[in-house]
A protein has these predicted regions:
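Short, aromatic- and glycine-rich surface loops/edge beta-strands on solvent-exposed regions
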Residues: 85-94, 276-281
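Short, exposed coil/turn segments at beta-strand boundaries within extracellular/luminal domains
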Residues: 94-104, 286
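Compositionally biased, intrinsically disordered or flexible polar/acidic segments
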Residues: 108-298
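Single conserved hydrophobic/aromatic residue that forms the stacking wall/gate
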Residues: 1-8, 12-13
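Surface-exposed, short loops/turns at beta-strand junctions within beta-sandwich domains
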Residues: 78-85, 270-272
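Surface beta-strand/loop "capping" patches
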Residues: 15-53, 111-117
Length: 298
């Protein structure tokens, strides 16, 4: 019997007929990818290939990346994705016959200096999220380094359960069908900085207040983790962008309600090579940020 079953976001191949060829590139439904790139030209990310062959040759855009030995019917291959369309081919040979599987995706290499167009960042997250409607990819946060982009200060928001912590909140966020953008956050963030070139940028800030006085039923995909209720926090903070105040006393829960998506857009000119800095100041409790999107207008 040969079968395929879905586990999380990957395909696990179950094979009991060893003589039948099995070959499958994982995550083929992920059509829009992105990642931080030091040169703006390529970004290396792992890609799993499932097969019952002893080895598999992997190609990127027609060029061989090498032949990889297979262990326990799976091999993880580091793919140097390039900007634009990427075609990945996996090839095995069984009894003199060649078998091939193919994966095609669009990739955005995020680099603030070379060809920067946009960056979409999930704060408090170490996961990716594909927005298929908008055809874009949200990438994990990183700490700021000179010449790049990232957060300054704060810590990942805890998502506590009776059995430990979840990597993200399980809350159903009101006002959006893109819950993963709002289910993680950085608490106590001081700033988000991007050393982008001079120009005009649209800056989108994404918030939701994940603490609430209301007990909500766990979502189906919570799988009975018994989330520990976090009490409501009266959170007030200020926001300024490149020295210009855009909010003096922002209270997300008071103004919009808890567990509700809030998106604010600002048009920001960048000049004199100073880059882009969004600063957060505590008024009561500590600031939060769930996600940020920076798009170059011109």
């Amino acid at each position: 019997e040969i079968g395929v079953r879905l586990v999380g976001s990957e395909m696990c191949i179950r094979d009991s007929l060893k003589e039948a060829p099995v070959l499958h590139i994982a995550s083929k439904s992920w059509k829009n990818r992105a990642g931080a790139s030091r040169d703006g030209k390529s970004c290396t990310q792992p890609l799993k290939v499932y097969t019952n062959a002893d080895k598999v040759e992997v190609f990127l855009n027609g060029k061989s990346l090498g032949v990889y030995p297979v262990s326990d019917k799976v091999v993880s291959v580091d793919i140097p994705f390039v900007n634009g369309e990427n075609v990945v081919d996996a090839v095995i040979e069984k009894e003199g016959r060649e078998y091939r599987d193919q994966y095609v995706c669009n990739f955005q290499c995020v680099n603030v200096k070379n060809g920067f167009t946009e960056v979409n960042v999930l704060l408090g997250a170490q996961r990716y999220f594909e927005d298929r409607t908008a055809e874009l990819c949200w990438i994990p946060e990183q700490a700021y380094e000179k010449g790049s982009w990232g957060y300054i200060g704060g810590e990942v928001a805890p998502n506590k359960t009776r059995y430990g912590s979840l990597p993200a909140s399980d809350k159903d966020i009101l006002g959006t069908d893109q819950d993963p953008i709002f289910q993680t956050q950085r608490v106590g963030i001081e700033a988000f900085k991007a050393d982008v070139p001079d120009g005009v940028y649209a800056v989108y800030l994404y918030w939701t207040e994940l603490t609430s006085e209301n007990k909500r039923e766990a979502l189906v995909y919570n799988l009975g983790n018994d989330v520990v209720r976090e009490d409501y926090i009266n959170r007030v903070f200020s926001v300024d962008i490149n020295g210009v105040s855009v909010a003096k006393q922002l209270n997300i829960a008071e103004e919009y309600g808890s567990e509700r998506a809030v998106i604010k857009k600002y048009i920001v000119p960048v000049s004199q090579g100073k880059g882009l800095v969004v600063r957060f100041g505590a008024v009561e409790s500590v600031p939060i940020l769930n996600a940020i999107r920076i798009v170059k207008e011109y």
